Amino acid sequence: MVIKEDCINNLARWQADEEAHSCFQCKTNFSFLVRRHHCRCCGRIFCSSCTENFVNYNKKRVHALQKKNSDVESPPYRTCNECYDNLLHLNLLVSSTNRDVRLSQTSVPPNALALSAPDSNTDEDAEILEDSVDQSGTACRSEESSQNEEDHFCPICNSDLTQFPDEEETRKHVEDCIQRAENAQQHTNTSDAADDSVKESPAFQNRMLVYKISPNTTDNAIKECPICFENMEPGEKVGRLECLCVFHYKCIKNWFHKRAQMTAAQKGNGHAFVKRNFCPFHDAVF
């Protein structure tokens, strides 16, 4: 198998069965009933419960490990829980059609259906077309503006990148965060001190599941964002922390940003981050 140099798991290896007597994550001893299962991302051996994710990898950044001299395995690949969380956070999981799993399919505006009608050359239909184009253009500009705002933050640790003096410092910060995330992804720790350093880093701790609420969500299932107290409507982008609290994505991002500013001011420096699993709701309660 040819391994690309830019794959985040190019240092991972397929662990031999005889090396593992218990699950790498939950430490359950293997037996006749508790079988060994390899994670195709990190190569470690886990029990079935800790490798219950079957996903497709971004082949440009992640290569699927397999046993030496074995037949080529087809996706989806069995993946341990930790690798799944990290790959999802790094946008390295794709659907069977090779699309980012976080991206929802683009919906066609209802008015656009009228454009395919045989007798759609009337003035009324022309007005419908114009309105539809205007609405689409406004939506696109809104999405572009939102994307530009997100580009101001580090995709790994959520630090405000506008705080850095130049592009070189910004690039160095992002590369450092990516390297820390890769080390955590590959379970590579050289010492106890390094282990503590990785666990304390924002790249290791900042984990948030970002997704859009399903359009099929019923009214009874719609919940209120604890930050803005507005309903999280179907189709809206939300973020779920490790405590399972869910917020509007923009609300939780703004909270992280403000919290980081407060932390930086208290520490007397310009660089700070807030853990994405440090919930603003629990912060207020406790």
Swiss-Prot record:
Zinc fingers (FYVE-type) by residue: 17-88
Membrane topology, from the record: Peripheral membrane protein
Protein name, as recorded: E3 ubiquitin-protein ligase PIB1
Catalyzed reaction equations: S-ubiquitinyl-[E2 ubiquitin-conjugating enzyme]-L-cysteine + [acceptor protein]-L-lysine = [E2 ubiquitin-conjugating enzyme]-L-cysteine + N(6)-ubiquitinyl-[acceptor protein]-L-lysine
PROSITE patterns per record: ZF_FYVE, ZF_RING_2
Effect of mutating C23S: Abolishes endosomal targeting
Gene name per UniProt: PIB1
Pathway: Protein modification; protein ubiquitination
GO molecular function, one term: phosphatidylinositol-3-phosphate binding
Comment field on protein domains: The FYVE domain mediates phosphatidylinositol 3-phosphate binding and is necessary and sufficient for targeting to endosome and vacuole membranes.
Entry-linked InterPro entries: Znf_FYVE, Znf_FYVE-rel, Znf_FYVE_PHD, Znf_RING, Znf_RING/FYVE/PHD
Function: Functions as an E3 ubiquitin-protein ligase. Binds phospholipid vesicles containing phosphatidylinositol 3-phosphate.
Keyword annotations: Endosome, Membrane, Metal-binding, Transferase, Ubl conjugation pathway, Vacuole, Zinc, Zinc-finger
EC identifiers of the protein: 2.3.2.27
